[in-house]
Amino acid sequence: MHSDELLVEILVEELPAQALLNEYKEMPKKLHALFNKRALEVGNIEIFYTPRRLCLLIKDFPLLTQETKEEFFGPPVKIACNNEDKTQGLNALGLGFYQKLGLKDHQHFQTAFKNNKEVLYHAKIHEKEPTKDLIMPIVLEFLEDLNFGKSMRWGNVEKSFIRPIHNICVLFNGENFNDIEVKEYGFKTKQATKVHRQESFDFIEVDSPKAYFEVLEKNHVILDPKKREAKILQEIKELETEHHISIEIDRDLLDEVVAITEYPSALLGEFDKAFLKLPSEIITTSMKENQRYFATFCQKSQEESPTLHNGFIVVSNAINKDKQKIILGNQKVLKARLSDAVFFYENDLKKPLDNAPLESVVFVQGLGTLKDKMERESIIAQYLTQKYAPSLNMPLEKALELVKRAVQIAKADLLSEVVYEFSELQGIMGYYYALKQNENELVALSLKEQYLPASENAPLPSSVFSAIVALSLKLDSLFSLFSVGKIPSGSKDPFALRRLSFGLLKIIAHYGLEFDLKADLKSLFEKVGVYQSFDLEILEKFLLERFNNLIDCNPSIIRSVLNTNERDIVKIIQKVKALKRFLDDPKNAQKKELLFSAFKRLANINKDRNPNESSEFSISLFKESQEHALFEAFNAIKTSAFEGLDSKIEAYFGLHAPLEEYFKSVLVMDKDIEIQKNRKNFLWSVYQSFLEIGDIKEIAI
């Protein structure tokens, strides 16, 4: 037998769920790196967790290390020996090389060639050694490599970790790993584990991976998080069937309850129906954020919107048989939470949205208050309303009035008691308060949708009206924060400006709104007139960089369009997609190299050209028939009215044949300077026309 199963359990105090889940994804990679570092070839690696333990299970862990050779290269022989033919031995420099390696016999030194030079050389052979001596150092290095964001110290221990470590249990090939002192964390190892607290508080000895799994299973610890998740989902499904309800599975919440339980049980509790008068989002948010409960809904047909049911699912970690006691305890806690929510909500309803003291809340240091932000957004919103009036299906005067009102009260709910308690309900509570205070329904809905989209694939504002309010918020935040230098760099983006920018582009693209990233940004910056001066090209470039996330496409095609003067968001997307369609077309896929060879040459000829240089040319100076042929084909395109981008691109790429013939027969760098200049100007004109679609030199095929 050359290998055996290795199991390592790291027993800790309760791990914070979110920190554990974030780092769990990185653990296999980090463990693999430690094995590779020591040239250990192992089998499958599995990592399990519960709130109290990390378990590393490695199949086919070798009993012995591999024999390895370590090579050392010293100084060149000609400066390390007393003479060039090496007969008089080593000088001080040569002796120093071997002394550093701890070698005393220098009589029979070796040499090797490195970088075409003969140098002193020594090879050290590392014999096979038992791997059992490597296990604890690997585990301790693994613990140091883990990054949970925060760590703590306890007692007089040397090292820190996210929570105190109580034991490291190593089970491998019947070896004894008891009583190894781990000074770094202040304990001695035991080949033992702990089980569910309701079963025992004591260590239980184990002598093999098989015994370890049996002990946990018998004592209500489900080690594998996938099995805990499956148990929860199965029990939820049974509750749905039994009680004729539907349960919305929140993925993040499910991951969290899996991470905080060792033996989960899904139980159904109820709350007083009187609480259903609250907006449903208050109830579901309170249940999720405060108690980690799943919301339940009345079962309806697929066409109907789900209605909140006065039930909740609590995932318990208890193993006692009296489930009703657990349910009653959770019902009591939820009742107190929802009673508080009713109090906050009713207090908020007494306060008119107009009266919210926005001037008392600082937006960002150096950027004024929420009232200042609201006033800036109002100017942006008026500009956008006039620009997109045809898409609003109402008279311009009415649209301007409603948009102004929406922006005026959009931030009022930030000062409400409910949003103070649940910040994720900003905008949503504004919607409910606006409806209760008889605001226009479009206005109310725009308050709810102003922060959309919340993530990459999240819903967008449901109308152009809401889109205008959402865009105003985003544009002001970008102008404001860029103007005071709060620009994202590297992984740092404290104001989530990348996500905000992506949302801005996605809204504009979805509704097909005209927005030029050069002209409109400049106009808005000047119209608002209160931002600190900064280079708008920095913001323009920042927004252009988001297109790679916006369009699923070969990045070089996106780059080719962005490398032109086109800055209208919708037109950029249309051109990228049209180029992609052309290049993906099976009839073009086989001849891409042929299509691009002439165009690449055209681009290379013009790569150093000054864009502002005159491109006038005269056909009277054309001497070759291929010049006339290319001009006629080019002129036919320039004077044609195309139905759309697809036919225009098809026509431009149709120039590849006359271009090929041109380059075969025409010498661009003619001895006659006038003819040379004329040919260059003509080719520049052809290239410039291509830039109406994309910069062909950027496209990688």
From Swiss-Prot:
GO terms for molecular function: ATP binding; glycine-tRNA ligase activity. The keyword Transport does not apply. It is found in: Cytoplasm. It catalyses: tRNA(Gly) + glycine + ATP = glycyl-tRNA(Gly) + AMP + diphosphate. Its EC number is 6.1.1.14. One of its GO terms (cellular component) is cytosol. InterPro entries: Gly-tRNA-synth_bsu, Gly-tRNA-synth_heterodimer. GO terms for biological process: glycyl-tRNA aminoacylation. PROSITE patterns: AA_TRNA_LIGASE_II_GLYAB. Keywords: Aminoacyl-tRNA synthetase, ATP-binding, Cytoplasm, Ligase, Nucleotide-binding, Protein biosynthesis. It comes from the Bacteria. The keyword ATP-binding applies. Belongs to the class-II aminoacyl-tRNA synthetase family. Tetramer of two alpha and two beta subunits. This is Glycine--tRNA ligase beta subunit.
